[in-house]
Regions:
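A short acidic, amphipathic alpha-helical/loop segment
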Residues: 15-23, 75, 91-96
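Noncatalytic linker/hinge segments flanking ATPase motor cores
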Residues: 45-52, 73-81, 103-108
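Conserved Lys-Pro-Asp/Glu-containing loop-to-beta segment of HAD-superfamily phosphomonoesterases
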Residues: 64, 69-93
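Short, hydrophobic beta-strand segments that form beta-sheet elements in well-ordered domains
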Residues: 32-33, 65, 80-84, 100-105
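Asp-based, Mg2+/Mn2+-dependent phosphohydrolase catalytic module
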Residues: 87-116
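Alpha-helical substrate-recognition element adjacent to the catalytic core
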Residues: 1-69
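Short, well-ordered alpha-helix to beta-strand connector turns
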Residues: 27-28, 61, 77-79, 97, ...
Length: 116
């Protein structure tokens, strides 16, 4: 099974990291698909926070995709599941034909339960 997570406001949250760790432990291939860019005007952007989380939970660097602000449905076609906090990205993933199912993640605020 191939599982993808957005990073900002999704995999950067501890409960989603715990979910990713469970998927990895069950043998799933886990990926990060982020709208971020890794280069801007020829300069490499470090994305240290993203790589730190990926290293800590066991996501391989080759499983990280920077979409450079392009729609994620173009990058998630071969995944089974993608989690994201962006409703438009999830709607697009579920609207365009592919095997990937998109699930909206709504981070919890002020001791509320997360919705995913």
């Amino acid at each position: 099974m191939k599982i993808s997570f957005d990073f900002d406001s999704t995999l950067e949250c501890e409960e989603m990291q715990e979910l990713a760790i469970k998927f990895i432990a069950s043998g799933a291939d886990v990926f990060i698909t982020t709208s971020r860019t890794d280069y801007h005007e020829g300069l490499k952007i470090p994305n240290n926070d993203l790589f730190e989380v990926a290293d800590r939970i066991g996501i391989k660097k080759e499983n990280i995709t920077f979409t450079k602000f392009k729609h994620k449905y173009k990058f998630t076609k071969d995944f089974d599941i993608h989690y994201d906090d962006d409703e438009i990205e999830i709607d697009n993933i579920n609207k365009f034909p592919s095997k990937c199912m998109g699930f909206l993640y709504e981070p919890k605020h002020n001791n509320q339960q997360a919705n995913f």
